[in-house]
From Swiss-Prot:
Transmembrane segments: none annotated. This is Small ribosomal subunit protein uS7. Part of the 30S ribosomal subunit. Contacts proteins S9 and S11. Keywords: Ribonucleoprotein, Ribosomal protein, RNA-binding, rRNA-binding, tRNA-binding. Pfam families: Ribosomal_S7 (PF00177). One of its GO terms (cellular component) is small ribosomal subunit. One of its GO terms (biological process) is translation. The gene is rpsG. It comes from the Bacteria. GO terms for molecular function: rRNA binding; structural constituent of ribosome; tRNA binding. It comes from Chlorobaculum parvum (strain DSM 263 / NCIMB 8327) (Chlorobium vibrioforme subsp. thiosulfatophilum). Belongs to the universal ribosomal protein uS7 family.
């Protein structure tokens, strides 16, 4: 019998907060392997969040935003007897966070012409207040799953 694998996740987390999810956000924001640039963008965004939020805790705002954006269910396509059905499926925890990172980055980059740090901070603040495009995307995915509840018995 072989040894147990190393498992998922980053060891240790980021430098400032020592948090694994912040390190994963930095990796999600990173383009072309430029990790220092991504780290600066995320830390600047957290500084903006700390100055704009009431309690001044950027990490708490980030965690709340992540929980508000992460989807619980999604639809997956399955072909049954010549017809394709959208089947609602529960989302695994690793995929939940990955989708949340993807949507936050995607909708932050689409915001108006400020710096990426300001756009990311605005999207995270909106998401923590149950607003913003990334929360709308999560609600849209949940609505799709709810509309296709009738096909739940086709589960994989």
């Amino acid at each position: 019998m072989g040894k147990k694998g190393a498992g998922y996740g980053l060891r240790g987390g980021d430098f400032r907060y020592n948090d694994e999810t912040v390190a994963r956000l930095i990796n999600a924001v990173m383009l072309d392997g430029k990790k220092e640039v991504a780290t600066k963008v995320v830390y600047d965004a957290f500084d903006i969040i700390a100055s704009k939020s009431e309690d001044g805790d950027a990490l708490e705002v980030f965690r709340k935003a992540m929980s508000n954006v992460a989807p619980l269910v999604e639809v997956r396509s399955k072909r049954v007897g010549g017809a394709t059905y959208q089947i609602p499926m529960e989302v695994q925890p690793a995929r939940r966070t990955a989708l949340a990172f993807r949507w936050i980055k995607q909708f932050a980059t689409r915001r108006g012409g400020r710096s990426m740090a300001e756009k990311l901070a605005a999207e995270l603040l909106d998401a923590s207040n149950e607003q913003g495009a990334s929360v709308k995307k999560r609600d849209e995915v949940h609505r799709m799953a709810d509309a296709n509840k009738a096909f739940a018995h086709f589960r994989f």
